[in-house]
C-alpha cells in the first residue's frame, strides 16, 4: 500500500494491467460527508472508514465516463490507503449523464454527478490536493480538454 502521493501509480498500474486507455483523465473521489453527521455521530469514535468505503475513481472520456470502486482506509500508522480497485466497474455513456461538474469550494473540490433521476456528490478535500501534483495536473488536464465542466 502507498500513500496518497503515490495513488496515481496504483491507479495507472490497474489501468495498464486491465488494458484501459488513460491519460491524465482520472481522479479519485471520496463520498460527500456532512460535518454535522460526523460531529453528532452516536458512537464515541466516528468510523471514517465506513464512509470512505464508497470512494470511487472516475475516468473521464469524450464518449463515456468509467467509474471504478476502490477501497480507501484510514490507518493511523500509515495514513489513508488505496486498494482493491475495480471490484465494481461501470461505463456510462456521456449522453446519459445529465450533470458532470467539478466545483471549487473553499476547502475542497466537489464533483456533482447526475444520471437521469439519480444524483451524487463526491469530494476531493484540500488535504488530498496539497503536495499531490498528480491531482492538480489531472484536474487541469480535464478542464483544458473539456472533459468536465468546471466552476470556481
Residue ranges and their predicted role:
Residues 35-38, 64-68, 74-76, 118-124:
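Short, surface-exposed beta-strand/loop "edge" segments at domain boundaries and coil↔beta transitions
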Residues 43-108:
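Phosphoinositide-binding peripheral membrane targeting modules
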Residues 82-152:
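Acidic, Ser/Thr- and proline-rich intrinsically disordered linker/docking segments
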Residues 1-62, 68:
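Anionic N-terminal interaction surfaces
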Residues 2-10, 18, 65, 72-74, ...:
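Generic ordered-secondary-structure signal
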Amino acid at each position: 500500500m502507498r500513500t496518497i502521493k503515490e495513488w496515481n501509480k496504483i491507479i495507472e498500474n490497474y489501468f495498464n494491467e486491465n488494458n484501459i486507455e488513460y491519460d491524465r483523465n482520472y481522479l479519485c473521489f471520496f463520498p460527500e460527508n456532512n460535518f454535522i453527521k460526523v460531529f453528532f455521530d452516536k458512537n464515541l469514535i466516528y468510523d471514517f472508514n465506513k464512509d470512505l468505503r464508497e470512494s470511487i475513481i472516475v475516468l473521464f472520456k469524450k464518449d463515456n465516463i468509467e467509474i471504478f470502486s476502490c477501497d480507501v482506509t484510514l490507518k493511523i500508522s500509515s495514513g489513508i490507503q488505496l486498494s482493491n480497485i475495480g471490484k465494481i466497474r461501470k461505463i456510462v455513456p456521456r449522453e446519459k449523464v445529465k450533470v458532470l461538474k467539478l466545483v471549487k469550494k473553499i476547502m475542497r473540490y466537489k464533483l456533482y454527478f447526475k444520471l437521469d433521476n439519480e444524483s451524487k456528490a463526491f469530494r476531493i478535500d484540500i488535504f488530498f490536493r496539497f503536495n499531490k501534483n498528480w491531482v492538480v495536473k489531472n484536474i487541469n488536464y480535464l478542464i483544458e480538454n473539456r472533459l468536465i465542466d468546471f466552476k470556481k
